[in-house]
Amino acid sequence: MILLPFHTRRLVSHVYCGLKPASKKKGIALEMARPSSNLADFREAFAKAKHIAVITGAGVSAESGVPTFRGAGGYWRKWQAQHLATPEAFARNPSRVWEFYHYRREVMLTKNPNPAHLAIAECETRLRKQGRKLVVITQNIDELHRKAGSRNLFEIHGSLFKTRCTSCGSVKENYKSPICPALAGKGAPEPDVQDAKIPVEQLPRCDENGCNGLLRPNVVWFGETLDSNLLGEVEKELEICDLCVVVGTSSVVYPAAMFAPQVAARGVPVAEFNMENTPATTSFTFHFQGPCGTTLPPAIARHETELIS
C-alpha cells in the first residue's frame, strides 16, 4: 500500500460504506455518533481485553518536544514535510533532504520518551505477565517507543536511525552524530537559513565492501509503498484485537488512517486519545481529549481486577 495524505471526505465515506442510510432524524443520528468520554466504561473494556492494538502518531511524541511538521507552523525552513519527504525531492536535491533528516536525527538524540510512551511500554510488560498481549503500531520514525521499552512494535514508516543504500539496498542502523562530516552543524530549520548545497559525494555513503552508494533515510516517503510483509503482520494484529487504542494520530495519512476505522467496523471498541477531534472520531467508541501524556496513563494503568505479579 502507498503512503498518501488522506482526504477527509474519502475517509468518512469509506468508514460508513455498507452501513444503513442515516436516519432522517438528524439530531438522533448525531447523538448516536458522538463517542463517549466515560473513563470508567473504557476501563471496563480495557480490563476485559486480551489483545490490544495501540496505534500512535506524531501527537504522542509532541509532548517530548519532537517537531510534528504538521499544521500551521509545520515548516522546516520554507518547506512542509510533505514537500521534502518524497523520492522526487531526494532525486532533485539530496543535500537539502539530508539536511532536513540530519536536523531531525540530531533533535531526536536529545529527546526522551514521555509519560504516554512509558505507560504504553509498562502496560505491555504488565499484560504479558498475565498472558495478554499489547502491540504498538506506530507511524512515528523517532524510535521513542523503542527507547521506552516497547517490544511488540511495528514501525510502519521506518526509522530516522536506519539508512538504506540506493545502490545495493543494504539497510543498517546508524546513530552517528553527525551522520557524516559534511552535515556537521547543518540542518538549522529557520526560514532564512540557506541550503548547504553539499556535493553528493560528501553525503552519507554506503560502507558495504566496494559499494560506496548514496544512502537515504530508511523511512517511507509520500508516494512510496509500505513493506508488504510488515503490513501483513499489522493487518493480522488488527483482525484479532479486541480493543484498539489510537493515540496522537491525525487520521489523515493513508493507509494508517484506515486501521482504527476498520477495527471499529468489526464492532470492536476503539478509544481515541488526542488533542482534538479527527476525521475518524465519530466512528470510535471513546474519545478522550487532551495531552496524551496526561489522559492515557490513567486509562491503561493497572485495573483493580488485574492480578499483581
From Swiss-Prot:
One BP term from GO: peptidyl-lysine demalonylation
Cofactor: binding details: Binds 1 zinc ion per subunit.
Principal location: mitochondrion
Keyword Mitochondrion appears in the UniProt entry: yes
Keyword Transit peptide: yes
Cofactor entry: Zn(2+)
SUPFAM superfamilies assigned to the protein according to its UniProt record, in alphabetical order: DHS-like NAD/FAD-binding domain (SSF52467)
GO MF assignments: NAD+ binding; NAD-dependent protein lysine deacetylase activity; protein-glutaryllysine deglutarylase activity; protein-malonyllysine demalonylase activity; protein-succinyllysine desuccinylase activity; zinc ion binding
Keywords assigned by UniProt, alphabetized: Cytoplasm, Metal-binding, Mitochondrion, NAD, Nucleus, Transferase, Transit peptide, Zinc
Record domain Deacetylase sirtuin-type: where: 36-306
Range of the transit peptide: 1-35
Active site: 157
Binding residues annotated for NAD(+), in chain numbering: 57-76, 139-142, 248-250, 274-276, 292
Enzyme Commission no: 2.3.1.-
Family membership noted in the UniProt record: Belongs to the sirtuin family. Class III subfamily.
Family annotation (PANTHER family): NAD-DEPENDENT PROTEIN DEACYLASE SIRTUIN-5, MITOCHONDRIAL-RELATED
Official protein name in the record: NAD-dependent protein deacylase sirtuin-5, mitochondrial
Native source organism of the sequence: Xenopus tropicalis (Western clawed frog)
Lineage: Eukaryota, Metazoa, Chordata, Craniata, Vertebrata
